[in-house]
Amino acid sequence: GLLPWVASLGPGHISRLERHVARREAWVVDITRGDGSVLEGFLRLDREPAAARNVSLQREAAICRTLTATDVPVPALLGWSDTHHAALFSRVPGSADLPGVDDPQRQRRIMEDFIGAIARLHCLDLDSLELDEMLGARPSTPAEAALGDLDAQLHAFAAFLKHYQDPLLGYGAGWLRRFAPRQIARVSLVQGDTGPVNFLFEGDRVSAVVDWEWGHWGDPMEDLGNICVREFWNPSGGLSGLFERYEQLSGIPYTRAAAQYYRIQQNVRGMIPIHAACSQPGLRESMAWYLSYRYVGDRSTCEALGDAMNVAVEAPPMPDTSKDRSVLLAAASATLQRDILPELGSPFARSRLNDARVLVACAEREQRYGEAVRAACCEDIGRLLKTQTRPYEQAIGQLVEAIAEERVADEPLIQLLARKAYREEWLYQPAAALYPERRWAALD
């Protein structure tokens, strides 16, 4: 079984096993050896591995094993099990809570050390890494570098997307193809999801860059777009001057247009599995957090598109909030918050119960305001397409078709998509409040 395999890596007996509070399943593990010494590990599991998947725990394990021999700080891989699709990493000292650092100057020093680690990563000799078998062929054109991971996501989720209509995903994917970079400085190993909270720090120094399951060959500018996105979700003092510092350290030219492009690429690529998760009953992971990622993320994508295209976007008026609340759903939410949450001792159980409370609150708002939000969206689509657009599902289908056929100009379409996203973020406010008042940091 899994636990005997984990214990054998000590070797010894498991003296600590605690569920880590995170979106993906992970466990804090201590293995006590016969001589009394303790191996401190971090166990990651992939319970639903997919063949030929471009995002995987196995990929992360291989990258960490390779990078241990470089000057890019990563957790050591202590063991990988093909049988259990499990990886045991060393538990690196440090904190990931960069937003919680209350000294702006220290926050800045940490981010500068981090950007140095990313600069070193992007300058590594690819042949010496011997990762081609795991990561596949390297991109041979700028378009392949920019679109390879997006195309892999579209392929991986083809069955879901065949029956799922979302105008922002459709427009975003098309936009990325239209505006893909025509030249890049080089192909690098990119982390693919890098930035605040995906690295640990001690003092003012990065102790480990973590979460490598998205790692791949690509344009180094992609990671700068990733940093924009992660700083959006995890505000850490802004980005002013950091990308210029990256250029000085790496010798790789930075452009504002590249950062604008790749923050949209990161969002569109990342939103495909998030939309899929939000459509999945009985999701093993936290639906509340996925709803937050979806609706805050969709709004941020629209704002990034507006910025890249010089299109002004703004929130529309929201529905009347005077409609009576659902007595049953309000009572359920209050019971979870008032009576059950205080009685739970496990941090993981408390986290999941709070997630359930958020879902109940979202259901209550959906019941009160969902129809009004969808009606407003139908009116917007009708004005744009100059046609009658009811019911809602039919209106969305007509918009998706118009986008695919390129019958709508960019500016009014981006503005419509933004109004839709603002309304949906408002509708799912209890989930969106998990990441309150998130805004893009200014770019160099």
Regions found by a protein language model. Give the residues of each.
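Juxta-kinase regulatory segment immediately upstream of eukaryotic protein kinase catalytic domains
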Residues: 1-14
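Charged, amphipathic alpha-helical linkers/stalks
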Residues: 307-332
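Active-site acidic catalytic loop and adjacent metal/ATP-binding pocket
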Residues: 22-32, 37-43, 85, 121, ...
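Short, solvent-exposed segments of well-ordered alpha helices
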Residues: 51, 195, 233, 258, ...
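ATP-binding pocket architecture of kinase catalytic cores
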Residues: 16-149, 155-168, 184
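C-terminal amphipathic alpha-helical interaction region
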Residues: 323-358, 363-444
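Active-site activation/catalytic loop segments of kinase-like enzymes and analogous catalytic loops
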Residues: 221-254, 265-286, 293-310
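Short, surface-exposed acidic
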Residues: 12-17, 252-260
